[in-house]
Amino acid sequence: MENRNNMTEFVLLGLTENPKMQKIIFVVFFVIYIITVVGYVLIVVTITASPSLGSPMYLSLAYLSFIDACYSSVNTPNLITHSLYGKKAILFNGCMTQVFGEHFFGGAEGILLTVMAYDHYVAICKPLHYMTIMNQCVCALLMGVVWMGGFLHATIQILFIFQLPFCGPNVIDHFMCDLNPLLNLACTDTHMLELFIAANSGFICLLNFALLLVSYVVILCSLRTHSLEARHKALSTCVSHITVVILFFVPCIFVYMRPAATLPIDKAVAIFYTMITPMLNPLIYTLKNAQMKNAIRKLCSRKDISGDK
């Protein structure tokens, strides 16, 4: 695969060109990135070290934390580096790698959220058959679908964008390489390509969102026959998941289900779904899940006891 242009690098304008603001941006996003990574490590260590969290539901949560950490790592380190050193140039291949990473991990996360909704449906509506339905083979198959779906989605996007001729300005008014800013720099008519890309991203977003809505409608209908305590526990789990779904899908639909014109609000929206949401996900699932909180307390108590010895 070979691109048809002589463009070797792009210039990312970032969030601001004000030196004082760049220092503030460096501190803020460095803290956000540290919280994201620490949240991922905390969740994975807690689930791995706690036998009570060995169900597929918590395995999916560990995968979600891993994907969030990777998703945030695609753009956040670059933004931090650019804010600290003022380096704005990014090589063409580096830009394409960013685009691929964004859509690989973003696509995988969208599919995983749908898988988690199915898992919640089975746990709430068919509790006696949960471990039979969500056996190791099914879990492995679903995780395979998550990764292959993300890879296929990202590959389609990168094949479209890599072949575009770039022969004019190379300045991107964004803090990351993304489809819409790149389409605006192409030296050709990109109208049909915009439709293909919107269809690809839109299909992923809308299909997963529709499946999620159906899952939760069925879950809510089935809760009418459950006890009050069971309803409260199920709703607590579902509210956490629905919150994460809204935080992830609404910004993505806003960005990718419209023409490629770049809007001033795009940077803020991109920050939200590529950095803020991955940071919030571990907090949302931990604070809303009694089993996770108890497991973290036990893990901390165990470390305190071993430290005293």
From Swiss-Prot:
<feature type="transmembrane region" description="Helical; Name=1">
    <location>
        <begin position="24"/>
        <end position="44"/>
    </location>
</feature>
<dbReference type="InterPro" id="IPR017452">
    <property type="entry name" value="GPCR_Rhodpsn_7TM"/>
</dbReference>
<feature type="topological domain" description="Extracellular">
    <location>
        <begin position="258"/>
        <end position="266"/>
    </location>
</feature>
<keyword id="KW-0675">Receptor</keyword>
<dbReference type="InterPro" id="IPR000276">
    <property type="entry name" value="GPCR_Rhodpsn"/>
</dbReference>
<feature type="topological domain" description="Cytoplasmic">
    <location>
        <begin position="288"/>
        <end position="309"/>
    </location>
</feature>
<keyword id="KW-0716">Sensory transduction</keyword>
<dbReference type="GO" id="GO:0004930">
    <property type="term" value="F:G protein-coupled receptor activity"/>
</dbReference>
<feature type="disulfide bond">
    <location>
        <begin position="95"/>
        <end position="177"/>
    </location>
</feature>
<feature type="transmembrane region" description="Helical; Name=7">
    <location>
        <begin position="267"/>
        <end position="287"/>
    </location>
</feature>
<feature type="topological domain" description="Cytoplasmic">
    <location>
        <begin position="45"/>
        <end position="46"/>
    </location>
</feature>
<keyword id="KW-0297">G-protein coupled receptor</keyword>
<feature type="glycosylation site" description="N-linked (GlcNAc...) asparagine">
    <location>
        <position position="6"/>
    </location>
</feature>
<feature type="transmembrane region" description="Helical; Name=3">
    <location>
        <begin position="104"/>
        <end position="124"/>
    </location>
</feature>
<keyword id="KW-1133">Transmembrane helix</keyword>
<keyword id="KW-0812">Transmembrane</keyword>
<dbReference type="InterPro" id="IPR000725">
    <property type="entry name" value="Olfact_rcpt"/>
</dbReference>
<feature type="transmembrane region" description="Helical; Name=5">
    <location>
        <begin position="203"/>
        <end position="223"/>
    </location>
</feature>
<keyword id="KW-0472">Membrane</keyword>
<protein>
    <recommendedName>
        <fullName>Olfactory receptor 4C46</fullName>
    </recommendedName>
</protein>
<feature type="topological domain" description="Extracellular">
    <location>
        <begin position="1"/>
        <end position="23"/>
    </location>
</feature>
<dbReference type="GO" id="GO:0004984">
    <property type="term" value="F:olfactory receptor activity"/>
</dbReference>
<comment type="similarity">
    <text>Belongs to the G-protein coupled receptor 1 family.</text>
</comment>
<feature type="transmembrane region" description="Helical; Name=2">
    <location>
        <begin position="47"/>
        <end position="67"/>
    </location>
</feature>
<feature type="topological domain" description="Extracellular">
    <location>
        <begin position="163"/>
        <end position="202"/>
    </location>
</feature>
<feature type="transmembrane region" description="Helical; Name=4">
    <location>
        <begin position="142"/>
        <end position="162"/>
    </location>
</feature>
<feature type="topological domain" description="Cytoplasmic">
    <location>
        <begin position="125"/>
        <end position="141"/>
    </location>
</feature>
<keyword id="KW-0807">Transducer</keyword>
<keyword id="KW-0552">Olfaction</keyword>
<comment type="function">
    <text>Odorant receptor.</text>
</comment>
<feature type="topological domain" description="Extracellular">
    <location>
        <begin position="68"/>
        <end position="103"/>
    </location>
</feature>
<dbReference type="InterPro" id="IPR050427">
    <property type="entry name" value="Olfactory_Receptors"/>
</dbReference>
<keyword id="KW-1015">Disulfide bond</keyword>
<dbReference type="GO" id="GO:0005886">
    <property type="term" value="C:plasma membrane"/>
</dbReference>
<keyword id="KW-0325">Glycoprotein</keyword>
<dbReference type="Pfam" id="PF13853">
    <property type="entry name" value="7tm_4"/>
</dbReference>
<keyword id="KW-1003">Cell membrane</keyword>
<feature type="topological domain" description="Cytoplasmic">
    <location>
        <begin position="224"/>
        <end position="236"/>
    </location>
</feature>
<feature type="transmembrane region" description="Helical; Name=6">
    <location>
        <begin position="237"/>
        <end position="257"/>
    </location>
</feature>
